[in-house]
Amino acid sequence: MADERNGRGDDNGKLLYCSFCGKSQHEVRKLIAGPSVFICDECVDLCNDIIREEIQENAPEEASDRLPTPAEIRETLNEYVIGQDRAKVVLSVAVYNHYKRLRYGEGKSDVELGKSNILLIGPTGSGKTLLAETLARMLNVPFTIADATTLTEAGYVGEDVENIIQKLLQKCDYDVEKAQRGIVYIDEIDKISRKSDNPSITRDVSGEGVQQALLKLIEGTVASVPPQGGRKHPQQEFLQVDTGNILFICGGAFAGLDKVIQERSERSSIGFSATVKSQDDSKSTGDIIREVETEDLVKFGLIPEFVGRLPVVATLTELDEEALVQILTEPKNALTKQYQKLFDMEGVELDFREDALRAVARKAMERKTGARGLRSIMEATLLDTMYQIPSEHDVSKVVIDESVIKGDSEPFKIYASSDHAKAVPED
């Protein structure tokens, strides 16, 4: 039976100490006695924290035993990403097959399943990065983003491709096993395209050279990565990370790819068999991009071997006004919900009128920044109000309409007391 002692010695008046940390009974609040052993309240709390951390670490592994189906993956993507239905289907199937391959590979089989890395093609702000982030969060796997424009061949100024794996390791506290099941998103992949179709005598260290360096990493190799500290401690042994099970998702805007596809289409339909097209038959950029083929990507500047390592291609379309309005209001972490939460913390209700949301969407379309530009527009609109509200304790509601977004008027404030009441525009 455990005995609690609070500031008292034993029956003989002898001073008691915690058997774990060595503190005396006068230095702690409680000292619990067992058979010839004592533990203080601080050590009990520490033990509880250790057990709690271990339970939390093991919980994701237990929860991830069941692999979500492609339909379930798409459903989760729908909660955070608006539109891009075709890309979601392609991604859901590719990710499901990838992680099914990892589980299938754990058993013995004569059939070896190849890895299907993914290429996302779509304009800025269409949701490429968000799709990759959402997938990693849903599957509870380490995730990192790399910028292809900062990469160079080994030996040149810039980041080596191995730095990508080091970033992934940092995300999971250098747990190699976890990192080997992670997801890497390489952004701006179109910026490392070959400068020309013709071989050059000068080295292209940030273009074709990087593609060559990425080849083995994406396909699957054992990368040697310096542990924590990197070059500061060259005597440390390098960590060996097998990239064969890491899912690589590459994304880029590929500006001008539509023209490459059109040229190829026109070449294939020259002569008497060619169909005469009117101006009404002209396709949108999104429709043209959907017809992308391997030869178009090679013509654009990606080397054939690199394209071959990215067999799954998903195209994203430019977001229209309706989609941008949905992005502002519908996802779980929609921008309007975020700002409403911030105002709610001050005890103020924030109301966005429909015409205001459409004005924000139109402004983002004019800037050609897609969904990425929505936050900067909202921030600029609400900045002064967010500065004033904490000092104005009588405000109960703030209303934003189209005139506020255009900069023609200030946000409308409704005060709790009638002395400060101000007219609010009708819907």
Swiss-Prot record:
<dbReference type="InterPro" id="IPR038366">
    <property type="entry name" value="Znf_CppX_C4_sf"/>
</dbReference>
<dbReference type="Pfam" id="PF06689">
    <property type="entry name" value="zf-C4_ClpX"/>
</dbReference>
<keyword id="KW-0479">Metal-binding</keyword>
<dbReference type="GO" id="GO:0051603">
    <property type="term" value="P:proteolysis involved in protein catabolic process"/>
</dbReference>
<dbReference type="GO" id="GO:0016887">
    <property type="term" value="F:ATP hydrolysis activity"/>
</dbReference>
<dbReference type="InterPro" id="IPR046425">
    <property type="entry name" value="ClpX_bact"/>
</dbReference>
<comment type="function">
    <text>ATP-dependent specificity component of the Clp protease. It directs the protease to specific substrates. Can perform chaperone functions in the absence of ClpP.</text>
</comment>
<protein>
    <recommendedName>
        <fullName>ATP-dependent Clp protease ATP-binding subunit ClpX</fullName>
    </recommendedName>
</protein>
<dbReference type="InterPro" id="IPR010603">
    <property type="entry name" value="Znf_CppX_C4"/>
</dbReference>
<dbReference type="InterPro" id="IPR003959">
    <property type="entry name" value="ATPase_AAA_core"/>
</dbReference>
<dbReference type="InterPro" id="IPR004487">
    <property type="entry name" value="Clp_protease_ATP-bd_su_ClpX"/>
</dbReference>
<dbReference type="GO" id="GO:0046983">
    <property type="term" value="F:protein dimerization activity"/>
</dbReference>
<feature type="binding site">
    <location>
        <position position="21"/>
    </location>
    <ligand>
        <name>Zn(2+)</name>
    </ligand>
</feature>
<dbReference type="Pfam" id="PF07724">
    <property type="entry name" value="AAA_2"/>
</dbReference>
<feature type="binding site">
    <location>
        <begin position="123"/>
        <end position="130"/>
    </location>
    <ligand>
        <name>ATP</name>
    </ligand>
</feature>
<dbReference type="GO" id="GO:0009376">
    <property type="term" value="C:HslUV protease complex"/>
</dbReference>
<dbReference type="GO" id="GO:0051082">
    <property type="term" value="F:unfolded protein binding"/>
</dbReference>
<dbReference type="GO" id="GO:0051301">
    <property type="term" value="P:cell division"/>
</dbReference>
<keyword id="KW-0143">Chaperone</keyword>
<dbReference type="Pfam" id="PF10431">
    <property type="entry name" value="ClpB_D2-small"/>
</dbReference>
<dbReference type="InterPro" id="IPR003593">
    <property type="entry name" value="AAA+_ATPase"/>
</dbReference>
<dbReference type="InterPro" id="IPR027417">
    <property type="entry name" value="P-loop_NTPase"/>
</dbReference>
<keyword id="KW-0862">Zinc</keyword>
<comment type="subunit">
    <text>Component of the ClpX-ClpP complex. Forms a hexameric ring that, in the presence of ATP, binds to fourteen ClpP subunits assembled into a disk-like structure with a central cavity, resembling the structure of eukaryotic proteasomes.</text>
</comment>
<dbReference type="GO" id="GO:0140662">
    <property type="term" value="F:ATP-dependent protein folding chaperone"/>
</dbReference>
<feature type="binding site">
    <location>
        <position position="18"/>
    </location>
    <ligand>
        <name>Zn(2+)</name>
    </ligand>
</feature>
<keyword id="KW-0547">Nucleotide-binding</keyword>
<feature type="binding site">
    <location>
        <position position="43"/>
    </location>
    <ligand>
        <name>Zn(2+)</name>
    </ligand>
</feature>
<dbReference type="InterPro" id="IPR019489">
    <property type="entry name" value="Clp_ATPase_C"/>
</dbReference>
<dbReference type="InterPro" id="IPR050052">
    <property type="entry name" value="ATP-dep_Clp_protease_ClpX"/>
</dbReference>
<feature type="binding site">
    <location>
        <position position="40"/>
    </location>
    <ligand>
        <name>Zn(2+)</name>
    </ligand>
</feature>
<dbReference type="GO" id="GO:0008270">
    <property type="term" value="F:zinc ion binding"/>
</dbReference>
<keyword id="KW-0067">ATP-binding</keyword>
<dbReference type="GO" id="GO:0005524">
    <property type="term" value="F:ATP binding"/>
</dbReference>
<comment type="similarity">
    <text>Belongs to the ClpX chaperone family.</text>
</comment>
<feature type="domain" description="ClpX-type ZB">
    <location>
        <begin position="6"/>
        <end position="59"/>
    </location>
</feature>
